[in-house]
Amino acid sequence: MPIITLPDGSQRSFDHPVSVAEVAQSIGAGLAKATLAGKVDGRLVDACDTIDRDATLQIITPKDEEGLEIIRHSCAHLVGHAVKQLYPTAKMVIGPVIEEGFYYDIFFERPFTPEDMAAIQQRMRELIDKDYDVIKKMTPRAEVIELFKSRGEDYKLRLIDDMPDEKAMGLYFHEEYVDMCRGPHVPNTRFLKAFQLTKISGAYWRGDSKNEQLQRIYGTAWADKKQLAAYIQRIEEAEKRDHRRIGKQLDLFHLQEEAPGMVFWHPNGWSVYQVLEQYMRKVQRDHGYVEVRTPQVVDRILWERSGHWSNYAENMFTTSSESRDYAVKPMNCPCHVQIFNQGLKSYRDLPLRLAEFGACHRNEPSGALHGIMRVRGFTQDDAHIFCTEEQVKKEAADFIKLTLQVYRDFGFTDIAMKLSTRPAKRVGSDELWDRAEGALADALNESGLAWEYQPGEGAFYGPKIEFTLKDCLGRNWQCGTLQYDPNLPERLDASYIAEDNNRKRPVMLHRAILGSFERFIGMLIEHYAGAFPAWLAPTQAVVMNITDKQADFAAEVVRILGESGFRAKSDLRNEKIGFKIREHTLLKVPYLLVIGDREVESKAVAVRTREGEDLGSMPVTQFAELLAQAVSRRGRQDSE
């Protein structure tokens, strides 16, 4: 009979097969009440599942990350229960867990309205209040098919067809409602009280726009109402920081239907863009990169040779001229290989680091576009390092160090690094993969920072390092990458003369730090809520007069600051000074300079910050020094 080993090493013996819930009850009533599921020998199971052999067991409660996922998955099933009660003709599709929430895809003859969503949420609360048990039944395949046929659930039947090897399936019963799932799920609806539906959007069956359109109901769920309230507060703050809203408020950019997914940069936004580009240009030049420029429209032949045409053609914009087919480049790498291939290269020329602020275009689905975060036309801070296999570790280590420095300059200090390793389907020998993964792992170790593996997540031709930033709202943004690639040099016949006078293929390291300028600027807007640090701010200082008598000196101050390389402007309107201060505070200008008669007399400026701090009156040269110090700090914290 089973001996159960618990996480603390203690053991409990039972003289009969025992469920996870019964083990929890034997430990204590409090734990039993909190039990959601169990992890038996590392595998998640339902609380009702029995253990009939010696095993290790971890009791899963709402405090565990796995417990939170179970709550969210069960809430998706609860959406199904409520929808089928309110709209019996609706057909249920799938309801998975996503980051911080869940959704359910549903086919219904008319669009759901906000009133429908409110009714669904209310019915879910009523069902939770019934405090009913969720019943699991492992059911033979044929019975499952008959059940869903009798209920007219066509999409469930299609999903069953996708699983021909499944002889029995888990059915979870919420009273009269039943759904099919691998589980586990909560044993009772009392665990689902801290939830909220968040939005409705469109979706397509199997994610294919050629298929029928579905409706997707999103929601979030948490272990308790305190966590839910904190999440809602964070989402409300995120809405206030939405880059689309702030972009309009600060006159940074706009998008319009005539050019979907293409950004119209206004002077203020283009100023931020230019600061980024000039900063990255200097950083890369200081680290041994040479800048290049390649065509945006390239013959189809090159994309066929590189492999992009067969794998990526549907995402490429194409055109024809004089009986030749062309593609607008979606990426820069094949073009950089063409530069490498011009002229004979020696091992002495390596590593060769080619960088480009490359304008790329990708035919993203219109439904996936989102402000400047997800666009069709974008610029990458792209570079490709051509090197020998022996140089990979040093190049990777140098890149990691550079990338972390750049992120700190932009105010990001919480950075996760991950190494994606060989997938099941891959090219190249295991020995080659061992060396490639080992070189990248050694480079990560040299950084002295924590990192983790992502097993099986590498490209089919090589491993990859990913950098993920956490912003002030705790959101993760995947930005930088370093991709090991021996494949493209082979396809495009890149070679160099090795020390033994034989031709060899270089290793190509694809790397980006910001990713796309558009997306990174969107991140910065939301991270800073538009209140950019002084070095990024479109206008670093605004000079305001109190009366017309100070207009000439105000213009003189703007001239002096401009000649010192600062972005300053004047506001000489015949408005009250309090009105001007409020307006430029809302425009998030870092420094507000007020000039009255005393300032004209003493050749000084009265300095305020956008946060409302009064820095007092000071000579213009002293303010210029203060601003220069603020700019030199970039986005770093004072303690850094």
Curated annotation (Swiss-Prot):
Residues 242-533 are annotated as: Catalytic. Residues 1-61 form the TGS domain. It is found in: Cytoplasm. GO terms for molecular function: ATP binding; metal ion binding; threonine-tRNA ligase activity; tRNA binding. The keyword Protein transport does not apply. Its EC number is 6.1.1.3. Pfam families: HGTP_anticodon (PF03129), TGS (PF02824), tRNA-synt_2b (PF00587), tRNA_SAD (PF07973). Zn(2+) binds at C333, H384, H510. Binds 1 zinc ion per subunit. Keywords: Aminoacyl-tRNA synthetase, ATP-binding, Cytoplasm, Ligase, Metal-binding, Nucleotide-binding, Protein biosynthesis, RNA-binding, tRNA-binding, Zinc. SMART domains: tRNA_SAD. Its cofactor is Zn(2+). The keyword Hydrolase does not apply. CDD domains: TGS_ThrRS (cd01667), ThrRS_anticodon (cd00860), ThrRS_core (cd00771). Its main location: cytoplasm. SUPFAM superfamilies: Class II aaRS ABD-related, Class II aaRS and biotin synthetases, TGS-like, ThrRS/AlaRS common domain. Catalyzes the attachment of threonine to tRNA(Thr) in a two-step reaction: L-threonine is first activated by ATP to form Thr-AMP and then transferred to the acceptor end of tRNA(Thr). Also edits incorrectly charged L-seryl-tRNA(Thr). Homodimer. Belongs to the class-II aminoacyl-tRNA synthetase family. This is Threonine--tRNA ligase.
